Amino acid sequence: MTHQPQQSPQFFLTAPSPCPYLEGQQERKVFTHLVGDKANEINDLLTQGGFRRSQNIAYRPACEVCRACISVRILAGEFEMTRNMRRVWSQNRDLIGRVHKAQPSTEQYALFRDYLDARHRSGGMSDMTVLDYAMMIEDTHVNTQIIEYRRRGPDSFMSAKGDGELIAVALTDVMADGLSMVYSFFSPHMQERSLGTYMILDHIEWARAAGLPHVYLGYWVEGSRKMQYKIRFTPQEHLGPRGWQRFEG
């Protein structure tokens, strides 16, 4: 009889449920729990294999007939901003992002609720309470950071701290080969800033500065309008049957 080591992950399959991206489709997921002292290493390997993390669970689509969800990662070292991206970068030069341990705050939750109510009122996260939010942030056994974006203040050059209200937040896993953007949200009242795009650009710069080759964006679904933004950040790689393949757009 073969015994699995205690640290070996066990995988489970969910029951079918309506797909949140493609109308009329059913989704299933394979998942495992990220616990123990090998959680970081396992999360790195699974993310490189197309998994995503939510709290202490790593999952990936395992649909019976559909393969529309494609894992995407940006090649940070080769990335060049488009003219529009340079405009977004310049427009947000008054912001500063500060990296914290993955700890929730009432200020974060207020912004999170504002974001959901304005942009995802009917989504699966729309009824999340403050306790649900705290679990989303804190329930991690891997190297997870939270980045808070605020306007620069008069002392920001010395203190590396922003000033004023919280404008945007990113929950990010720091891995051996890159940054994985787990979830991000921002003020829905500042559409002219394109804050979602700005946070991705900021993560690319962070990865470059840290010598990390990739920024993982999760899944892209062709034909899904809410996912379309992800393929604007090129060059990038898509995960397929033959491994990671370069994609230029």
From Swiss-Prot:
It is an enzyme of class 2 (transferase). The keyword Cytoplasm applies. InterPro entries: Acyl_CoA_acyltransferase (IPR016181), Asp_Glu_LeuTrfase (IPR017138), N-end_Aminoacyl_Trfase (IPR030700), N-end_Aminoacyl_Trfase_C (IPR007472), N-end_Aminoacyl_Trfase_N (IPR007471). It catalyses: N-terminal L-glutamyl-[protein] + L-leucyl-tRNA(Leu) = N-terminal L-leucyl-L-glutamyl-[protein] + tRNA(Leu) + H(+); N-terminal L-aspartyl-[protein] + L-leucyl-tRNA(Leu) = N-terminal L-leucyl-L-aspartyl-[protein] + tRNA(Leu) + H(+). One of its GO terms (molecular function) is leucyl-tRNA--protein transferase activity. NCBIfam families: PRK01305.1-1, PRK01305.1-3, PRK01305.1-4, PRK01305.2-3. Functions in the N-end rule pathway of protein degradation where it conjugates Leu from its aminoacyl-tRNA to the N-termini of proteins containing an N-terminal aspartate or glutamate. This is Aspartate/glutamate leucyltransferase. It comes from Brucella suis (strain ATCC 23445 / NCTC 10510).
